[in-house]
């Protein structure tokens, strides 16, 4: 769609005007064709990844694509809500996790700017990513344990 055109044009424009200093890093679920065409499998992060290359995909734009597991994306999504007060969805958690992973792997320091686009809201995920029972039933019990804080009543009563 039109959004894809803007993304491609913006990415190429920023690369051009920065003389190559700007890098475009894609975030994609482990199991998507973009991450590894030889290892396509099911994943639970919604609204991202594909099992085919759409016509709008411009492989020359991303400098790197960072793979993110469902557990990594969901944990970051829940942490963003708990620690930062940001109610975002799984693809946003995936984007933030991939930015942090990229920054660590490439030894970025405080003088380097990283911009993360968070493409979704968490409103649609109240019965999934933000539901402890759903998370446990889908194999993410360890994520629930790491991201669940005691209630105020449990802490003070």
Tell where the protein language model's regions lie, with residue ranges.
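Active-site/ligand-binding loops adjacent to catalytic centers
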Residues: 14-90, 107, 129-157
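C-terminal intrinsically disordered extensions
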Residues: 12-17, 101-104, 117
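Short beta-strand segments
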Residues: 26-28, 115-119
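Short, mixed-charge aromatic SLiMs
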Residues: 118-129
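Short glycine-/acidic-enriched loop or helix-start segments at secondary-structure transitions
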Residues: 8-11, 36-37, 98-99, 126-127
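Nucleotide donor/acceptor-binding cores
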Residues: 111-113
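Buried hydrophobic packing segments
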Residues: 10, 77, 95-103
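Short, small-residue-biased leader/transition segments that mark boundaries at the very start
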Residues: 1-6
């Amino acid at each position: 769609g039109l959004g894809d055109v803007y993304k491609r044009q913006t990415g190429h424009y920023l690369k051009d005007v920065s003389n190559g200093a700007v890098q475009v890093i894609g975030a994609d679920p482990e199991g998507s064709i973009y991450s590894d065409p030889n290892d396509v499998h099911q994943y639970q992060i919604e609204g991202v990844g594909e099992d085919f290359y759409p016509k709008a995909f411009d492989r020359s734009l991303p400098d790197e694509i960072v793979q993110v597991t469902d557990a990594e994306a969901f944990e970051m999504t829940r942490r963003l809500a708990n620690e930062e007060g940001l109610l975002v969805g799984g693809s946003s958690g995936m984007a933030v996790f991939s930015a942090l992973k990229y920054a660590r792997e490439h030894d970025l320091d405080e003088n380097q700017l990283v911009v993360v686009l968070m493409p979704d809201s968490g409103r649609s995920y109240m019965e999934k990513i933000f539901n402890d029972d759903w998370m446990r039933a889908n194999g993410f019990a360890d994520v629930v344990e790491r991201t669940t804080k005691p209630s105020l009543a449990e802490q003070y009563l």
